[in-house]
Amino acid sequence: MLKKLGIKGRVLLLTLLPTSLMALVLGGYFTWMQLSDLQTQLLQRGEMIAEQLASLVAPAMGNHNTQMLERIATQALEQQDVRAVSLLAPDRSLLAHAGPSMLNPPPAGNSSHMMQRSGSDATRYQLPVFGRHRNLAGDLIPDESDRLLGWVELELSHSGMLLRGYRSLFASLLLIAAGLAGTALLAVRMGRTINNPLTQIKQAVAQLKDGNLETRLPPLGSQELDELASGINRMASTLQNAQEELQHSIDQATEDVRQNLETIEIQNIELDLARKEALEASRIKSEFLANMSHEIRTPLNGILGFTHLLQKSELTPRQLDYLGTIEKSADSLLGIINEILDFSKIEAGKLVLDSIPFNLRDLLQDTLTILAPAAHAKQLELVSLVYRDTPLSLVGDPLRLKQILTNLVSNAIKFTREGTIVARAMLEEEHEDSVQLRISIQDTGIGLSNQDVRALFQAFSQADNSLSRQPGGTGLGLVISKRLIEQMGGEIGVDSTPGEGSEFWISLNLPKTRDDAEDLPGPPLLGRRVAVLENHELARQALQHQLEDCGLEVTPFNTLEALTNGITGVHQSEQAIDLAVLGITTNDMSPERLSQHIWDLEHLGCKVLVLCPTTEQTLFHLSVPNPHSQLQAKPACTRKLRRALSDLVTPRRARSEPEETLSSRAPRVLCVDDNPANLLLIQTLLEDMGAKVLAVDNGYAALNAIQTEPFDLVMMDVQMPGMDGRQSTEAIRQWESERHGTPLPIVALTAHAMANEKRALLQSGMDDYLTKPISERQLAQVVLKWTGLALRNQGPERASERPELGLELQVLDQDEGLRLAAGKADLAADMLAMLLASLDADREAIKAARAANDQNALIERVHRLHGATRYCGVPQLRAACQRSETLLKQEDAKAFAALDELDHAIGRLAAEARTNA
């Protein structure tokens, strides 16, 4: 508090505060003492008056002279402070009274001495009158000295005493106030003697601060202040001299700068030339990267193209598996090359991430499958552990995520000489619409020091440069991975101990999508028992989880002999084991020994599936009865494992018989889509696979068709003019409820659906949904799933759509259009022609909706165009539609820029079509 006061205020406070406290304490003490003395005097005077009255009234009481008593009582009122007097008989009956009624009640008790009772306004006295009191009047009667003659009561008022006390207090306060006033005057005078010189010093310092260094202070009237003023004057003189020297130095420096201007100008010219050379070098680098991109992607596209052609030919399951691995490897290589070439685009923040559904377990296992040969060549064990509480169906950019995992696993393989590499996926936190995941890659390699960890995520750097020539690499992989993870809103890090290994981890938040029905256990395997042999503990644990996810009851064994004995012991019992999965290497046993054990197990009715390293598959090829179906590479993929075990339990020939029974009639399918190209494609694909199709282009026609004809399934487009897909579904469900009929399966067809939109589709009454473009395999699966009727001529499983990477997407891709049309050139041409015919109208409709600021109409028109692009080879327009629709639905401010890019993409496609016409 004192810090906020000035010197004058402090002087006043320190002077007046102690004085005031002392004056108040002393004044209060003496006033209290005086009031106490006055009260004591009042009590003594009351006792004295009572004694005097007792002597005066004793003869009258003895003679019962009432008049005398009245006269004495009246005379007693003339005494100071006496308020009332009462004279009582021995029985306390009233003999005489003078004055008003007494305020206080009589004292309690019956004492022979004087009694009193005090109140706030008066004090009441009571004294007994005995015969001895007559002695004072000279009227003593023998033997009556102790006889009670009566009582004397009087009451003294406190008002006089209080008045005298108040007068004394008032006088004390006057004296205190006078003393404080004098003290205050002295304090003010003292404060001025201190404050005025300080004010002069303050003003002088302010002038010095403003640059008036000639300012000097006069003598201030006291030794201490004069010394302070002298010091300030010396400081001002020193500052003045320093300023003069500084000004001289500035003038000299200015002259030097003026002399060096020509040199600086020459340096600026040299810097400008160097900048131009750097820009030219950057341009040359960009051209080189573009040329390299073309030169590298061209053979890769050839590999992918011929892989697709081979997949359409008659191949064994093993060959199809090899082709699938080649295709996935080529896709990964193409993606990695494009990302490296696009490193500058990542740094500029212009990289656009995809947002599509994917299966986390499949992505992780596919990554390990691609890299398994490199790991097995070094005799490393690859293990994938996906914790059971981890959601598998997520939404994100699977190709970018796979690229990151490929980089991490590849690094782990490079820098691990022996041991195990474990890929884990676990749930950290789950919300209603999203999950927080942690994916880690742990190895038993060389480990990293703290210095290596700090430099790990820098461009063109490696943890151990001494090893760079052996494993290879540019040092860009982790930098690109870190940038991609950060753009996804996640985090990447590493925990490592030199000599013990490293664990790279990713923490990422991804939206959830609906559960994948294919992940549920299927009837062929549900409840069956399987024996497992795997010497590696983590690999055995992962394999056991995979088999349990397939619906199997797993019994692990430590040796092949123990497994054979265990199966023999339960043979021909209710606990018989139908299947055996053997994870082996040549270090565990020879192919000849394995062949003998498989022969023994086959005779016990137990089908065997062998898992071995990719580098040893040729060695074990002749050890199994059917290597195409009973031999797989480590680490096992859950989907391949389920398919292989299902084939062992129920061979395809046996399973085809009930399918032929089911498919004895063709399924009747109603297709609803307002886009003629989409409607034509779905109708053609279904009819080519043997379905009976009725195609309509609006919801009203669909409702009318359902009310007049029986159907097994409805393929319903979501966004249509008039009655859209949701409204049509609700109308169909209402009509079914009125007729108490069996609900007809309705599958939504949509070009773009986020997680919340997919939930809304299912809540509106639809049973399932498919995302465009739709392949023959997807159509066959959904028809079989909801009708139980199989379609024929299902092509091999291929990715329906592959996100394009690179610096620029193609405007028109004829090969992609042919692939999306299931290899039908006429259909692909018709689809493209129908898209181009409606392109101008769609462009104008989008512009009109944008000008009218009609958000719903804008989303509807973009979605309609997006659906049409899903079946044509127009990658650039499709990507622009998808980005625009996503940003519009998210109400993102970048949506307008995306719409501008969409308009440019439409123009480029129209120009390209005219050029190729």
Curated annotation (Swiss-Prot):
InterPro entries xrefs: CheY-like_superfamily (IPR011006), HAMP_dom (IPR003660), HATPase_C_sf (IPR036890), His_kinase_dom (IPR005467), HisK_dim/P_dom (IPR003661), HisK_dim/P_sf (IPR036097), Histidine_kinase_BarA_N (IPR019247), HPT_dom_sf (IPR036641)
GO cellular component, one term: plasma membrane
TM region positions: 11-31, 168-188
Location of the protein in the cell: Cell inner membrane
Signal peptide positions on this chain: none
Domain Response regulatory residues, every copy: 668-787
Every HAMP domain range: 192-244
EC number: 2.7.13.3
Membrane topology: Multi-pass membrane protein
All residue ranges annotated as the HPt domain in the record: 824-917
Sequence positions bearing Phosphohistidine: 294, 863
Matching PANTHER family: HYBRID SIGNAL TRANSDUCTION HISTIDINE KINASE J
Protein's UniProt name: Sensor histidine kinase GacS
Taxonomic source organism: Pseudomonas protegens (strain DSM 19095 / LMG 27888 / CFBP 6595 / CHA0)
Gene: gacS
